[in-house]
């Protein structure tokens, strides 16, 4: 396997995680929901990685807070939910349900999962047996329903 998935445990009041996928041969990386840029920058510098993509699951500040600084430091493409473009001005690659895109030779599938927010998306990578689901699903349950309905969240969790 040419990839390594890293979990950055962010020590803030919301106890966020930042996921980073490293492509070992190229030393390129993608970061998912970078709440704080400094954690990402420090990790990339310590491991000689170049950040090339940012993937966002939804518009909440604890998932997009580090994007402006990372955009200043790296030449990155920013992927995120088309339905939340008005709330996430950084997105230059808007995504919608059942769309796919690439990171190196990985195929990333996008699923819309409204409930936590109306435009929430998740990233499914079959080759890594991984689902990056933002605030849709937690180890002890699902995320809070802020914008959507409980029916939408139920449908999203069943996808």
Feature names for model-found ranges:
Residues 13-22, 56-59, 77, 135, ...:
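Non-transmembrane, interaction-prone segments in cytosolic or luminal domains
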Residues 1-3, 76-78, 151-153:
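Short amphipathic alpha-helical surface micro-motifs
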């Amino acid at each position: 396997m040419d990839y390594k998935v890293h979990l950055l445990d962010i020590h803030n009041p919301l106890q966020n995680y930042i996921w980073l996928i490293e492509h070992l041969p190229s030393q390129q990386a993608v970061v998912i929901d970078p709440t704080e840029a400094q954690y990402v920058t420090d990790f990339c510098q310590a491991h000689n990685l170049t950040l090339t993509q940012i993937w966002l699951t939804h518009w909440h500040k604890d998932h997009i807070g580090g994007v402006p600084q990372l955009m200043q430091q790296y030449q990155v493409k920013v992927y995120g939910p088309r339905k939340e473009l008005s709330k996430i001005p950084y997105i230059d690659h808007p995504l919608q349900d059942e769309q796919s895109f690439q990171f190196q030779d990985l195929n990333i599938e996008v699923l819309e999962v409204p409930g936590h927010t109306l435009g929430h998306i998740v990233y499914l990578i079959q080759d890594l047996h991984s689902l990056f689901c933002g605030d849709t699903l937690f180890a002890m349950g699902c995320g809070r329903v802020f914008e959507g309905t409980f029916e939408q969240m139920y449908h999203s969790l069943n996808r």
